[in-house]
Amino acid sequence: MALQTDTQAWRVEIGTRGLMFSNCVPLHLPEGQYHKLRLPVSAYEALAVARYGLVGSLWEVPAVNSALQCLAAAAPCKDVKIYPSCIFQVHAPMFVTIKTSLRCLNPHDLCLCLICVGAAILDIPLLCAPRDGAGARAAEGQAAAAQGGKLRVWGRLSPSSPTSLSLAFPYAGPPPVAWYRHSINLTRSEGVGIGKDCAQDHACPVPPQGHASSAADQAGVPERGRKRAHEGPGAGEAASAGRGDVALSQSRALLWRGLGWDTGRGRLAPGLAMSRDAASGSVHLDIQVDRAEEGWVCDVLLEPGPPTAREGCSLSMDPGLVTLKDAWTLFPLHPEHDAVVPPKEEIHVMAQGHLQGGTPSLWGFTFQEAACDQWVLRPRVWTAHSPIKMTVYNCGHKPLHIGPSTRLGLALFWPAERSDNLDAGRIFYQLTSGELYWGRTVARPPTLTLPVDELRPWPKLTPEEPMQH
């Protein structure tokens, strides 16, 4: 059960880990150590062959349609170093980059395996922030009515139940039952390092207009594939009976627009509730989360009137990635400055961002060696508070121009032998700051679970498309 390519130089067959590629004829290599070899088939063609009769069960595996395809070494060879090659274009011919001092490879010296990286569900941490120009900020534990009836409240949240965080503040203004539009900003004052303690600094960072989301947003996320029933205008009032003057946020205009989560896929309903104690003149703010923990600071903007269909409530997210020990995932890595790599040479470049964390200096992690049809990325080891450096080798015949807009996809891997404690191997990468955090200090934020195939720009394989010959 094998596929002979048009050049009959490669053999494709079924292996224990996926589709196996091996050279059928001797491969003569030019001078040099690094070599880029072109396979005359694409990832789509290889998987399509499996789909159309050879390996029908392989196509049914969710990993095929929900992960980035990657060529990796199927069997070690002491004389040949094989670099894993990320396949960003499934319809383009596959490439493999090797390092060897041999001038000729005998048949079956080069054994490759087409695998799927990240064939699991990723937890995308949700961060959030209010919109710009939303009125004056109040002191911690206080509240002040701003112009136009807006109210901004901020302070440290305390767990009031296993699934809720609460803040009480004095307020003598109109009843909060009229406030429906809102933006929620949840920030950890310690741990992940995604924000400052707002109690100490009144100038907490606020993202640009049109960017806001909530770590509590996922409290109302329906299960994937199931749509939430349309809530009527009185649904919140009926659910809040017995709590006094309570206003549950209307969520009909809250739509997730990040990473393919849109109107056709579901809605987010932040669990925001307020109750007023007339005797003490205070208002209690409750935010529903999946797990209540200490260390959260909130910044909430409340506005009168329901949101319009055009305006809605602005939402955005920081699609940071969390991985654990023995797991690896992909994240974008960009050079900090423009650089030119001469043909068949390598240079050391600095990447955007830096590392944060409290792990000992002897504890580090590596990025898996990776390659594409233009460059090879050499492995490096980093520790806390160090810049991210990488070595880029130009495997082509023309100068390679790279810069801040050049995305280098890498696989982040945590060595299994470092620790048996999952917390010690936890890594969080924040995309907005380009920083990495790991170890016990990483507090995992509430998350929205998304399938890997939502991560663009890698196209989804479809058996309906014709094979390209």
Curated annotation (Swiss-Prot):
Pfam families: Herpes_ORF11. Residues 203-244 are annotated as: Disordered. It comes from the Viruses. Belongs to the epstein-barr virus LF1 family. This is Uncharacterized LF1 protein.
